[in-house]
Structure formats: structure tokens, C-alpha cells
Amino acid sequence: MKYVHFDSLFRVINWLDTDQFDIALPDSVLPVTDAQWRYRDRECWVNPIAGKLVTTPPPGEFYRLSGDKWVYDASAFATALEQVKLQVVQSIKQYRDELTADYIVIDGNHFHSDANSRIQQMTLAKMGQAGAVPPGLMWQTKNNGLIELTNAIAAQFEVVTIEHDMRLFAVAQAHIAAVAALDDIAAVELYDWSQGWQP
């Protein structure tokens, strides 16, 4: 006897010939004729209720077999779309977090904005506002090397950091809203969320 072994989506995953081999048959099998056996090199599905082999492939990705007809599965599409959106949103949030800890810009200088730098900058902001930054204090930037840290620069740390965080949050939310509005998986995957982050 010849059989096809199929999965939960009724897709044939194995062709079994018990005449040639001593095989313990799995649960989900359907006997096939010699004529049907000719299709063993093609992708096939089964209609177990009618005992039929389906050789016509689905017309698209989100179709399921109902009897021996392919029907569009809107629920499967919606689930897949939601999963892709979640992945893109996660990437947007991760990028936002990386930029948050990257740098802030004051007078064209890029100052580190990781957690340790922010702690130092809070104190420096108070010193700058009070005019208490020592003259000649040199500070490392990400783009211009060592620069003299003046009271005018130091006084801006707090406000610029808050503006930086608020801007990145707003940009992330705008990208997340744009992704949420898309109703096509390819459009979600191709959406370019890399724009508009840093000044």
C-alpha cells in the first residue's frame, strides 16, 4: 500500500510505500493510488474527508485548504501582519534607546549621553548656571575631541538633554503610528524608520 503523511495544514510531508519498506504508519496518513503516487515529486496537500490528493498549490501565502478548495485566511494574515509590526516597533524602540544614550548636541559639539555622562552633566549644568565651571576645564566630545567646557555650554546640559529625550520619544511614536497604520506586510517590512532622529 502507498500512503501520504500530512501535517496539521494538510500539507503532504512524506510519501510512504509499505510494499517496499516495513514502515510503522503515523496517525495522519491517507492511502493513495498508483496514479496519485506519480505526484510524489510535487508539493501536494490532502482532503482527508474526501480522501483526495490536492495538487493545485494555494494562490497566495495566506490561504488554507477547506475541503479541496483554497480559501483566504484573513485571520492568519492579520496574525502575521501583527507579528511583523511588533518586530518593527521593537526595532524602532531599540534604536530610540541607542540614540538616547549616544549623544546630545550643544553648539555643534556632540556630548556623550549615556547614564554616567548624564549624571556628570547634571552637576555641570548647575555649575554652569551658577557661573562656577573652572576656567580652562577641558571636556571630551564625540566629534570634536577635547574642548574647553564653558559656563555657557555647561548651563545647557539639562535643557538640551530633556529636549533630546523628548524629540527621540516623539520621533519614535510618529514612526510607530505610521507602522500601525500600514495594512500590508511588505509595506511594514520596507518602512524606513531611520529618518528624523538626530539634528
Residue map of PLM features:
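A preference for well-ordered globular domain cores
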Residues: 1-2, 7-39, 47-199
